[in-house]
Amino acid sequence: MTRPTSSAPSQRMLRVGEQVRAAITQVLQRGEVRDDIIEATVISISEVRMSPDLKIATAYVTPLGVSDHSIVIEALNRHAKFIRGRLGPQLRQMKYMPEVRFRDDTSFDNYKKIDELLRSPEVSRDLDGDNDDQ
């Protein structure tokens, strides 16, 4: 019997992703990464997505107060092996320590664009026009 393939993450992937997110957050909050760029930036980790085999963790981060996110993302990726090593004590239950990759989280920008679009005069006019038809 074959299992149906699904693109949705499993409960285990979600649970492990949340554990990895919490562990990375603690490493960054404690200032264990010695890098001027990382130490000078407040970094928000919104989500960690795990690969199906739990060997790759992709962390989606938003550097706050920085206009060029790519500099912070590059610094995090330079220190990814160090961060992976610091996750060990917090994730002892895992058979393999996942490789950590950092990506820029664009979801906040997408939400902002959608909000601006919904507040635009054209959309407001269309929404008000719908109420007149009823």
From Swiss-Prot:
TM annotation in the entry: none
Keyword Cytoplasm applies: yes
Coiled coil, from the record: none
Subcellular location, record wording: Cytoplasm
PROSITE patterns, per database record: RBFA
Single GO term (MF): ribosomal small subunit binding
The keyword Disulfide bond appears for this protein: no
A Pfam family it matches: RBFA
GO biological process, one term: maturation of SSU-rRNA
Keywords: Cytoplasm, Ribosome biogenesis
InterPro entries attached to this UniProt entry: KH_dom-like_a/b, RbfA, RbfA_dom_sf, Ribosome-bd_factorA_CS
Gene Ontology cellular component annotations, sorted alphabetically: cytosol
Task performed by this protein: One of several proteins that assist in the late maturation steps of the functional core of the 30S ribosomal subunit. Associates with free 30S ribosomal subunits (but not with 30S subunits that are part of 70S ribosomes or polysomes). Required for efficient processing of 16S rRNA. May interact with the 5'-terminal helix region of 16S rRNA.
Family designation: Belongs to the RbfA family.
Subunit structure as annotated in this protein's UniProt entry: Monomer. Binds 30S ribosomal subunits, but not 50S ribosomal subunits or 70S ribosomes.
Official protein name in the record: Ribosome-binding factor A
Organism field: Rhizobium etli (strain CIAT 652)
Gene: rbfA
